[in-house]
């Protein structure tokens, strides 16, 4: 079983540039957790609660990171610790300051 959250929007103060650290910006997270048979019983107590996953992402993003890679890695590690999935994939996107691209992104996978 795979659960997914796409486009979880979080405001944070991540980045290398002083204006990114000072003013902050929006970040979008896509999270995939491989959870085995958890949830097949149709009981929330047996499953991974999507709200708790979103809360964990927000908590990690409440810290400051210079690099998207570090933010994605720490988020993936925290989700592994809290929910013990078989695998987790975290992708973080942002609109980069000073680059003429739609977005930049970093992806971390565990294990």
Language-model region placement:
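N-terminal, polar/charged subdomain of small-to-medium soluble alpha/beta proteins
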Residues: 1-111
